[in-house]
């Protein structure tokens, strides 16, 4: 969790990932754990999760009122109700868990942030996080190419701000995949800073070992053109881009390649450069970065420090995490904390 992780310590300590799994299995949703400790319903259907929650609501005789909340009603420093399009709903406790501004087709359009701001809360700038990245053309050239087990370094101007290992994919607009989505969470200053990526295509090999590998391939293909000498080392689709980046004439015979040229190729293989134009729109982001300032919320109960009886949960808060189910766990843990505290309101 790259931002405001400490705020979540209390909520996570009382309801963690194991508690979440036990909860849903108790609701009749069998789960499975896949690569990377990612947990899914055995059915692979997200619908089974929402259906199980709805069954629990009905069992607990919870009333579901389908209306669009317009504003909070606040009296004497505390919540007194919610005003909707169809009328007023009196309440001594209200939980705002309206999500972020990603995926607006789901109804998550940022109205909760507006209501929080009207109640006096600070809402930090809203941006897309876990979002694909646009580049200046390499992605379109390599569209459809997926690279597994590569290293990634993100540079903000010339300063290294993030490094990781995993899988990425080139698309018609740029880059995506788990590695790129997590990296995007650290790229928050587009317009103020320049970002570029360095992809280590052979992270399992240090430069000396990779150089020996190149020498072996060059000996094998010594009479070939350079552009035809990398087939054992790289995916076919990637080779023209590597040749271009190396600066070596694609028709140069391998036996004529100098030691200095080979060292340049080695640098490209360990630091293949991609200049980033910017993120894709926030509507394409998996989660929203930014939200209600956590310093204005009690971390144990999720209650507002400014308005009595007002609670927050999930993506409306200024907390977001990497891909891998962490953002869902934030929703479960903060939702439970807010729900228990709100239920105890007089």
Predicted regions and their residues:
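Catalytic, metal-anchored helix/loop core of enzyme active sites in primary metabolism
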Residues: 1-15, 177-178, 206, 210, ...
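Conserved N-terminal/central alpha/beta ligand/cofactor-binding core
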Residues: 1-63, 68, 170
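An anion/pyrophosphate-binding glycine-rich loop and adjacent beta-alpha core
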Residues: 29-30, 122-127, 132-256
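Flavin (FAD/FMN) cofactor-binding core of flavoprotein oxidoreductases
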Residues: 39-46, 129-138, 279-296
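Short hydrophobic core segments
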Residues: 65, 69, 82, 88-108, ...
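A glycine-rich dinucleotide-binding beta-alpha-beta segment and adjacent secondary-structure elements
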Residues: 65-71, 240-320
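Conserved beta-strand-loop-beta-strand element in the redox core of flavoprotein oxidoreductases
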Residues: 71-94, 148-158
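A conserved FAD-binding loop/helix module that cradles the flavin
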Residues: 93, 100-119, 318-346
């Amino acid at each position: 969790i790259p931002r405001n992780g400490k705020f979540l310590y209390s909520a996570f300590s009382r309801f963690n990932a194991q508690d979440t799994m036990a909860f849903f299995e108790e609701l009749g949703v069998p789960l499975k754990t896949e690569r990377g400790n990612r947990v899914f319903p055995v059915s692979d259907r997200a619908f089974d999760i929402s259906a199980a929650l709805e069954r629990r609501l009905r069992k607990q005789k919870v009333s579901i009122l389908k209306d669009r909340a317009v504003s909070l009603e606040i009296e004497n420093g505390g919540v007194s109700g919610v005003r909707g399009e169809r009328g007023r709903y009196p309440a001594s406790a209200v939980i705002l868990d309206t999500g972020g501004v990603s995926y607006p087709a789901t109804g998550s359009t940022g109205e909760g942030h507006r209501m929080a701001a009207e109640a006096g809360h600070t809402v930090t700038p809203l941006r897309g996080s876990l979002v694909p990245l646009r580049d200046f053309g390499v992605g379109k050239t390599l569209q459809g190419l997926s690279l597994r087990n590569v290293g990634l370094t993100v540079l903000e101007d010339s300063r290294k701000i993030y490094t990781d290992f995993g899988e990425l994919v080139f698309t018609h607009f740029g880059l995506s995949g788990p590695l790129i989505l997590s990296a995007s969470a650290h790229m928050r200053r587009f317009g103020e800073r320049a970002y570029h990526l360095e992809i280590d295509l052979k992270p399992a090999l240090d430069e000396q070992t990779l150089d020996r590998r190149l020498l072996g391939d060059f000996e094998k293909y010594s009479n070939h053109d350079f552009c035809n000498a990398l087939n054992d080392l790289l995916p076919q689709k990637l080779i023209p881009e590597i040749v271009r980046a190396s600066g070596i004439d694609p028709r140069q015979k391998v036996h004529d390649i100098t030691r200095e040229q080979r060292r340049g190729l080695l640098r490209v293989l360990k630091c293949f450069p991609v200049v980033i134009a910017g993120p894709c729109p926030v509507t394409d982001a998996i989660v929203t970065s930014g939200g209600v300032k956590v310093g204005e919320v009690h971390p144990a109960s999720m209650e507002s420090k400014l308005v009595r009886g007002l609670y927050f949960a999930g993506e409306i808060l200024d907390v977001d995490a990497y891909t891998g189910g962490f953002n869902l766990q934030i929703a479960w843990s903060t939702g439970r904390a807010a729900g228990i505290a709100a239920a105890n309101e007089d």
